[in-house]
Amino acid sequence: MATAAFETPKLRRYPVIPLVQVGAMSHLKPFVAAAPLQKALGFPETLVEDWQAKAIAKMGELLGKYRSLQVYMDACVHCGACSDKCHYFLGTGDPKNMPVARQDLMRKIYRRYFTFAGKYFPRLVGAVDLTREVLDEWYSYFNQCSECRRCSVFCPYGIDTAEVTMAAREIMDSIGLGQKYSNEIIGKVHRIGNNLGIPGPALENTLEGLAEDTKDETGLDVRFPLDVKGAEVLLITPSADFFSEPHVESLIGYAKVFHAAGISWTLSSLASEAGNFGMFIGNYDQMQRISMRVREAALELGVKRIVVGECGHAWRVAYSFWNTLIGPFDFLDQRYPVPQHICEFTDDLIQRGAIRFDKDANDQRVITFHDSCNVARGSRMGSMPGGQFIIPRRIITSVANHFHDMAPHTILESTFCCGGGGGLLTDDLLELRVKGALPRMEALKDAVDEHGVNFMATICAICKAQFTKVLPYYGFDMSMVGGVHQLVSKAIRLGDK
């Protein structure tokens, strides 16, 4: 691994609130989207001349459109409950990575232009003009938030910094200041159908290769169908599952589950992506346009059910937004959840005894589980409260003998972010990603030391990609991370009657 241009934080035995380092991350900004990327999404190609007036007008539009945003602007009492809850503050010490300080970047503009006191007595209420210097701060620090929502769990008023960040990014896009990584990915989905830009013929070839590899492993014809009309299930999964390790191991696991259960399924070349970066940039229209591919594919293929693969923010969009974005789903079989997570699907089969496992097949692994933010704090799973926590763990303990959770304050709804979500999984933000992973790495280190953990399962493509990149910075092997259905794939018994 190449030498990093920054210092990796030291792992500590006990969590420590860092000393404040003013401006520690002020230098870090993601690449700005070039004109062609902006134009393709309908945004101004470069920063518009009257950007200040348009930004203020856009803020006014969002304040009227999303009542919660105005509540968040008004409700904060600066109690400090959130200040040490952000993984980026814990990893960098930059006070502007405290959730309250990140909110205040917008709040001081809100007060200046949308409150009586701010208009006439700005200094008394901390209101400031929207200058280019302030805009640059916005671009830096609103692109240092992974929208994980951990801070909102601890806020006594439930202020959601993720929503504030989304609003700020939407404002910046509207005046021609977009983030390259996220906007480039959204453009690929519109042009090709997935985040990685894998065209249909390449996808078909990849799936054929996986079928051959799986037959070599199992001796059985486990299918990876594409664009099959009349299949019962349409699987919408992150495109990383088609492309790289460890993601592809979970795709193989999905296929084995469908095979063992005897349920017909298909992937779609039109909707070959579960991820939806429209949510990360806070743009409802982009989110809807990406999601509409799923509806069109489901109608075209005539499926009865839609199942979503292992992707955290994709599941949040599906669970929390699809109904209003692309519903109603009256053309699907209403006996099943709409949509349904692949873990719900597999767990249901396990509970009914429809699939069986050899748990000993995973005995070389001592497993822990990383709760992904958008699953933990942006959705549910199954019919019971907390199902998003119970179901993945129940699958793991059904397919493996050795499982240990990490420390209680680092899991479930208090889980720490992987450090790469929210549109930040780009190498121009690598320093932030590595430092932001510190709290999770410390919890993992404790589990390794106390229980001999050697495998961290997760159900998010971004988490898998992020951990694969940052684990070596903290002395761990990148192969330590993988999907829940990677474990399922290893243990499932195929061909049993």
Task: Give the positions of each predicted feature.
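C-terminal amphipathic alpha-helical segment
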Residues: 342, 348-397
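Short cysteine clusters
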Residues: 76-82, 86, 145-151, 155, ...
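Short hydrophobic beta-strand segments
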Residues: 232-242, 365-376, 457
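Extracytoplasmic substrate-binding proteins
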Residues: 173, 294, 324-332, 346-362
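Intrinsically disordered, low-structural-confidence terminal and linker regions
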Residues: 1-40
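Cofactor-cradling patches in redox/metallo enzymes
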Residues: 158, 242-332, 376-387, 391-398, ...
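Iron-sulfur (Fe-S) cluster-binding segments and ferredoxin-like electron-carrier domains
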Residues: 84-112, 153-172, 380-386, 423-437, ...
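Iron-sulfur-cluster electron-transfer modules
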Residues: 11-15, 19-22, 45-49, 57, ...
